[in-house]
């Protein structure tokens, strides 16, 4: 690494970005069971099991509410088609609450299969790293003391922007994992809503939201692939320009590319909902 402070600051900012990007690549290919050694998943599964008893009790409540809403009188419930429909709904709701964790794991596995297919088709095993061009390093190292003063300001601003964008992006990806854990913990309560026709929209909304959370990983991977293709052709640097101009031009174009990826990652949830109607 160069001994120049300006170069070191930019390289440290790019190192932070590359580390967070590599961490994202690992996170989107990781299952909730393996995340952080599985300790969080174990706690959520324990909560899921405890909440399941509440879900089973709510099935009865939602079922009675549904019967009272759809059947005007007790005589209506005696009709075979109505009774069979109510029984099937009750049985399916109980199955959803009892086997909800397995159903959610199956949905997540399908989404992870999609992520793996996208990565294999694109031929990417890891994201492309952002590297400071040699021309900029040479130009900055050749600057005198007074010439380097404006470079300090430009470097501080650029380094701060790159670092902030890195943490915004990684926080969004971690937020996806936390949402999946929250869905896992309270799933029995939401699944119990399928027992009643008036409340089934709660269960449908829950399943759609969980599916959208799973599919966010595919959108994030696509964003990383797009950024990697951008990073494969680094910003063009004019070797005849002043050092401060070269650095400012490089940082400006790099931050624009970073904003594309950060924006894609942050909008992954909305993009999935708009594309899939979830």
State the predicted function of each range.
Residues 191-208, 240, 271-275:
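Alpha-helical transmembrane segments
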Residues 58-94, 186-200:
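Hydrophobic transmembrane alpha-helix segments characteristic of membrane transport
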């Amino acid at each position: 690494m160069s001994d120049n402070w300006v170069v070191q600051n930019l390289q440290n900012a790019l190192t932070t970005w590359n580390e967070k990007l590599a961490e994202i690549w690992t996170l989107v290919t990781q299952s909730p069971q393996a995340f952080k050694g599985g300790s969080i998943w174990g706690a959520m599964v324990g909560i899921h099991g405890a909440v399941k008893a509440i879900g089973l009790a709510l099935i009865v409540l939602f079922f009675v509410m549904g019967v009272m809403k759809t059947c005007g009188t007790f005589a209506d419930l005696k009709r075979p088609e109505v009774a069979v429909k109510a029984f099937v709904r009750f049985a399916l709701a109980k199955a959803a609450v009892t086997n909800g964790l397995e159903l959610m794991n199956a949905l997540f596995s399908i989404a992870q299969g999609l992520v793996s297919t996208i990565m294999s088709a694109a031929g990417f095993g890891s994201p492309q790293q952002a590297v400071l061009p040699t021309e900029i390093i040479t130009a900055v190292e050749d600057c005198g003391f007074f010439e380097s003063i404006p470079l300090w300001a430009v470097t501080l601003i650029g380094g701060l922007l790159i670092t902030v964008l890195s943490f915004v992006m990684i926080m969004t990806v971690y937020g996806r994992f936390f949402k999946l854990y929250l869905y896992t913990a309270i799933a029995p309560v939401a699944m119990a809503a399928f027992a009643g026709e008036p409340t089934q929209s709660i269960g449908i909304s829950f399943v759609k939201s969980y599916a959208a959370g799973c599919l966010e990983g595919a959108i994030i991977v696509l964003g990383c692939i797009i950024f990697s293709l951008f990073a494969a052709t680094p910003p063009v640097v004019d070797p005849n320009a002043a050092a401060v101009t070269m650095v400012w031009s490089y940082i400006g174009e790099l931050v624009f590319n970073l904003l594309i990826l950060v924006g894609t990652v942050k909008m992954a949830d909305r993009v999935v909902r708009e594309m899939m109607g979830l």
